């Protein structure tokens, strides 16, 4: 029996992007507030990307002064898998390398023995260190995640001394943290 391991392994990917915004203003000021959520499913099972973002911008004029403020915050999560060489116990391959090297005569969906232990396609025929990892087993055991939070903000004030001369002061921050995990 020949199995379509490659065709069965991949899934349809998709992306959804939802945005909401509100803005307003008058002759002396304006504002903009937005929120968004992006969700993407990868073509490899268990993979994807999500991002939530909030943003606020405002400007206010008062006499000779103009104030500006901008703030943005985002949270992003990337769920991925090992696609090529690199992790311990992976025999130097990743899910994509293993997928295209998997024998068509073996059903790749069978990656666990009845007792829950890892199924080895070459059990007893080659050393464990030279074994080929099953891509489905790798998806269950090498779950890589990156979680990133980012904050940006800026503030400025501008003083119009004359119609051709002005002074301004600007300050800002851009800060992020990323946590990586491998389960």
Predicted regions and their residues:
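Predominantly transmembrane beta-strands of Gram-negative outer membrane beta-barrel pores used
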Residues: 9-10, 17-39, 43, 53-61, ...
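Periplasmic N-terminal accessory/gating domains of Gram-negative outer-membrane beta-barrel systems
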Residues: 3-13
């Amino acid at each position: 029996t020949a199995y379509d391991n490659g065709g069965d392994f991949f899934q349809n990917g998709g992306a959804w992007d939802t945005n909401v915004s509100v803005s307003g203003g008058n002759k002396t000021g304006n504002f903009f507030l937005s929120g968004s959520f992006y969700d993407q499913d990868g073509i490899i099972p268990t993979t994807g990307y999500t991002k939530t973002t909030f943003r606020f911008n405002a400007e206010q004029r008062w006499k000779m002064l103009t104030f500006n403020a901008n703030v943005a915050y985002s949270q992003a999560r990337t769920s991925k898998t090992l696609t090529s060489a690199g992790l311990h116990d992976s025999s130097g391959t990743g899910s994509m390398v293993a997928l295209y090297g998997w024998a068509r005569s073996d059903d790749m969906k069978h990656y666990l023995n009845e007792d829950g232990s890892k199924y080895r396609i070459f059990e007893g025929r080659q050393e464990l260190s030279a074994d080929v990892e099953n891509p489905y087993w790798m998806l269950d055991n090498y779950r890589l995640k990156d979680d990133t939070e980012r904050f940006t903000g800026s503030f400025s004030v501008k003083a119009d001394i004359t119609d051709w001369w002005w002074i301004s002061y600007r300050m800002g921050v851009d800060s992020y943290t990323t946590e990586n995990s491998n389960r």
